[in-house]
Structures are given as C-alpha cells and as structure tokens.
Amino acid sequence: MAIDGILKQGFITTSADKFLNWAKTGSMWPMTFGLACCAVEMMHAGAARYDLDQFGIIFRPSPRQSDLMIVAGTLCNKMAPALRKVYDQMPEPRWVVSMGSCANGGGYYHYSYSVVRGCDRIVPVDVYVPGCPPTAEALVYGLLQMQNKIRLTNTIAR
C-alpha cells in the first residue's frame, strides 16, 4: 500500500522514467535498412567524420539487438513485407527514423506502381529526415531529435 501512495504522487515513477530514458538515449542501437542511395549517406554518418559513437549510437547487424530502425531509400511493394517482419523482430520499445524523400513519401518514384508511398504505411515512423539524399548532418540532427523524443517519453506510467 505504501508503494501505491508513492506512485500516485509520481515521485518514484518520474525519477525512474528520467533514469531509464537517459539510459536509452545514451545507447541507441540502430538497425540499418538501406534500400537505395540514402544508405550511402547513412554509412557516411557512421564513419569517422561524424562518428555517431560519440552520441552512443552504434549500428547493429541484427534486429533482435536493435531498438531503432533507419529506413533509408525507396521502399518497393516487394520489400514491404520484409520491412514489417524485421520491425516485428525488434524488441520493445522500438523506434523508426524515415530517411530521405523516397522513404518519407515515395520521392521521385511516387507515381510508380511498384513503390510504397512512404514507409509510414508499413511501420509507425517517429522522425522524418528530409532530403534527396539527406546529408549526413541531417541524419545526425534527426537522430538527436529522436534522442530528445525518447527523453520526453514516459516509460513506466503511460
């Protein structure tokens, strides 16, 4: 009963939320889902010049080890089920960053019969990074915005 009273006041949950969100923002592990030319800029962001490791962002090869997916490039209808399957294999909580105008809304290939007009039709997207292709700086900015969004999210008391 004493714990319920403290939880109603919000002190313990607020402190635990802040700690958990701080830990999550300092250790984001993205799963790369490079589909087109935006993937080259994503690799550029992970290289020595921009060094995403300094933000605690380390690329992982497996969806079971990742909590963030970066969808970079044109998503075709045949690739959409694979994207959803990889997303479903990621542990909770999971987030998605849509990188480039093709992933955001189909881009140059918007009216093609074989292109999904935005990956948000397949998976829920948290941050959109515009550009064709977006620069590595834009991706870093988008990832920093993702960290801010995670920091402000309630984990325990929803």
Swiss-Prot record:
Keywords: 4Fe-4S, Cell inner membrane, Cell membrane, Iron, Iron-sulfur, Membrane, Metal-binding, NAD, Quinone, Translocase, Transport, Ubiquinone. It is found in: Cell inner membrane. InterPro entries: NADH_UbQ_OxRdtase-like_20kDa (IPR006137), NADH_UQ_OxRdtase_20Kd_su (IPR006138). Its EC number is 7.1.1.-. GO terms for cellular component: plasma membrane; respiratory chain complex I. It is an enzyme of class 7 (translocase). The keyword 4Fe-4S applies. [4Fe-4S] cluster binds at residues 37-38, 102, 132. Its cofactor is [4Fe-4S] cluster. GO terms for biological process: aerobic respiration; electron transport coupled proton transport. It is a peripheral membrane protein. It catalyses: a quinone + NADH + 5 H(+)(in) = a quinol + NAD(+) + 4 H(+)(out). Its main location: membrane. Belongs to the complex I 20 kDa subunit family. NDH-1 shuttles electrons from NADH, via FMN and iron-sulfur (Fe-S) centers, to quinones in the respiratory chain. Couples the redox reaction to proton translocation (for every two electrons transferred, four hydrogen ions are translocated across the cytoplasmic membrane), and thus conserves the redox energy in a proton gradient. NDH-1 is composed of 14 different subunits. Subunits NuoB, C, D, E, F, and G constitute the peripheral sector of the complex. NCBIfam families: nuoB_fam, PRK06411.1. This is NADH-quinone oxidoreductase subunit B. It comes from Bordetella petrii (strain ATCC BAA-461 / DSM 12804 / CCUG 43448).
